[in-house]
Structures are given as structure tokens and as C-alpha cells.
Amino acid sequence: MILDPLSPNIENHTQDEIIEFWEKTESIANIPKENLDESHVNSSLVAYLKFATDSYKVFINTDRDLYRMSLILLESSLFEFKKEFCLSKLQSLLNIDLLEMNMKFIIVYILLCEAKKNVYSLEIMLKFQGFTVFYNTLYTQFAYLSKYGKERTVASKHQYNSNNSSTGTSLDSLDRSLTDIDLGIIDEMKQISTVLMDLLFQIMKYCKCVIANLQIVDDFFVYYMMESMRSDTMDDMFNNAEFKLLLALNEQYMMFAKEYDIENKVYKYLINGSVSRCFTELLLLKFNRASDPPLQIMMCKIIYLILTPRGDYSPMNFFYTNDLRVLIDVLIRELQNISEDEEVLRNTLLRVLIPLLKNTQLSKTHYRKDDLNKLLNYLSTLDNICVDSPALHEHQVTVALSRKCLQQIPWLETPSTPSDGGSSVSSNNTSRNSSIVALGTPDNQNILARKGHLYSNRELDVSAESLTKRKAKAPPPPPPPPPSRKCGTPK
């Protein structure tokens, strides 16, 4: 929920007043078709935003009210016939630094609703520099929160801990240096930030970003999200939005690393245990409970980075032994339960399994050796994983990766080699007499080295300092907000 359901309404209204409010809201948005020129659309859109802003926390008090307000605009003739103009206008208003906080929130919420209602609208937003607008607006919130929101975060963490203990300082004493107005501003900024982070996540999930988007992301932006992460809650929307955006950013860095020598700023702070401790704890919790395949794949990619040695960094002692066992348990469970139509996810999980068994303490403890042998040998046979459907490229990759894992991990059983010397899977899907794929054949090497492979370009070293070196340095100070843009009120 974006709005706090426990916060009291500022005013109580009769049923007639509520009906009158929503009727007036609809009348502002639904202008006659003959008045759909840009001048009328502009004035009506601004009038709608002002009316919604003035009614926020007066008539608009719940998530349901907020969504209804957004939907009235998004389904109106005003928006449907002039969608590009409306989206560009909404984004231009966000560029006004001194725009009222509540109006900023209303605008970003409307944009997020439209993005989730119609993915194509994300492309329109990008056309009008949406990534830069959202990033700069979010950056400004982060710069303020890093300076004034730290005590509020400490207070929230203490409140959580005090609920589980009999002693401790009260929340009020931790918040004593912040006035009620300060706390209100911090909460409003977190609300706006939550929506903006979700918008950026949607862009990275569904749209093709360009390298210029990543180049404007600086160290402070990534550092703030990583350092302010909490692992004591799974339900905090701000925290969850930070987590998802870091996953999406990391995925973008990995994709662009195939073509560009670009520093992965997520990885840079990820291997610094003093900064990423809470993020890593939350990662393990969410990886164990995740049910959304795209999010699972994003988590796999970041776990893969952690488990891969680079430069001075070694993953051998990054995770505790119990955490490693949890990872193995989750991987075995997921690999067994994945349906045939989610074979890409199984491919990704297998790519994580290899460095997990090879580069961590599991290489010495041999945890669940028999279960791993049984599972990997089963997945090494093509007929086992696509019984009722034709063999696809993803099925062949599953077989190849399973055999690769058995061959590369010394303490696992090496799979038997077919008597014909290692023939590959026949291109004819109706004839699969050779059910085990041999990794030694050129065809199967191409499967793993194909252009666009998830972890191709492994030789490209990510520019990041070792954990030991970075621990000795103080974290970078938060920079000031971006240079002020043209200020004023919407016209």
C-alpha cells in the first residue's frame, strides 16, 4: 500500500459530498472532443492535477481513492486522444524543482498507473527523456533522505527491535531532533521515491535501455540504495522498491558489459560487505520465497556475480555456511519443480549452481552430494525434461549445463559418455534416440558461447576494488541534489 491505512482522515464527509467530489473530478477530465486542441488539453490537465492535489488527504485518503483518481484521468477523452502530449506535460512538470510535493506524488502515481496499464506508454515516456526525468527527480529525494532521513530509519529499525525486546529507548527519543513537519516531509519523499523506483524498474524490465541511461547513474545513487537497505522487513514498500531497482540496474550493467567497458556500480558496492550486508540478507530471504520468474532470474544474476572470482575478490567466504546450504536447498527445490515452459529459469538456476559448488565452502563440505548427483544426472537426459513436447534450444541448454556441472565439480559423479563418442541432439525433434548431450561437441559449445548468452564476455573485468581495500575507506559522502532546473508553478 502506498498510503498508510492507519492515518486518520483530515476531514469527514457525507455521502453526498463524496459523490459530488467524484462527479466534479470526472467533469474536469472529460472535456468535449471539439476542445481537444493542445491549449484546452493543457489547461484541463493542469486543472485536474491541481484539483486532485488539493483533494489529497481530504477526499483522497486511501489507495483505492488514489487509484480511482488516476483511472478517471487515464480513461478520459482528455488523455486517450492526446496521450503523448499528456505524458510529456506530466514529465515536464516533474522537472520543476519547487513543484508542490503532493502534486509531484500525484503525477508520478498517475504515470506509474499508466505504465502498468499500458506497457507501450513506457516507450512514449522514454521518447520524452523519461529515464532522465525520473532519475533526476529520484536523485533529489535520495539526496535529501540521505541527509535527514537517516535518523528516521534508525528509529524505525529500533521500533522493530523494541517490539521484540523488553528494554530500549523509545521511538520518540530517537526522533527528538526531527519535528513533526520534518518527519512528514521524509515520509512524503519516501512515498514519491517508492513510485519513482517502481517506474524505473518497469522501464528496465520492459524497455530497451540505452547506454546513455546507465551513464548518468552515479555512485551515490547506487550507494544510497544499497546502504539504506533493511533486512528486518519483507513488507516495507520503499525497501522492496530499492531492492528491485538494484536487481534491474545490475541486469542492465551485465547486458551492456557485453559491448561496453562500463563499471558495474551495483557490483562495486555489493562486494563491500559493510555496505551490502542488509541487501545480501534480504536477497537470501527473497530468493527462498520468490515466485515471479523474471525477479528470480534477476536475483540469480546478482548471485552469480557474487559467486564469480574477479581480480582480488574471492567469493569463498562471502556467505556463511548455513546461507550456502539454504541456497543449495532452494536451487534443488526450484530445479525439480520448474515446468517445461519455464526452462529459461532452469537454465539460469543451473548457471548459478556451478560457481556455487565450485567457488565456495561447499567445495569442501559436499552438502547434499547424493541429491545433486541424482538431480543433475536426471537433467542430463533430454527425454526426462521434455517428455510431451519437442526439444527446444532451452532444453538442450539444460542438458548441456547439467553435464557441465557434473564434469566441472570434482566431487560429483561424471556422467557417462554415449558410446558413439558424444553425439549431439538431433535437429529432428521427432527422433531423439541419443538422449544425453555431450559437451565436447562443437554444437553444444555453441549453445553455451552463443552471442547474447547471459554470462558471455566473462573476460571483461569489472572495475571494482577488493573488499579489504574498500573497508579501509570511508563511504563516499552524499552529493548535493542535481543543479536546480527552471523553477515555477505549472501553467
From Swiss-Prot:
It comes from Saccharomyces cerevisiae (strain ATCC 204508 / S288c) (Baker's yeast). Residues 414-435 have a biased composition (Low complexity). GO terms for molecular function: Arp2/3 complex binding. This is Protein LDB17. Belongs to the LDB17 family. Keywords: Cytoplasm, Phosphoprotein. The modification Phosphoserine is found at residues 7, 463, 466. It comes from the Eukaryota. GO terms for cellular component: actin cortical patch; cellular bud; cellular bud neck; cytoplasm. Present with 329 molecules/cell in log phase SD medium.
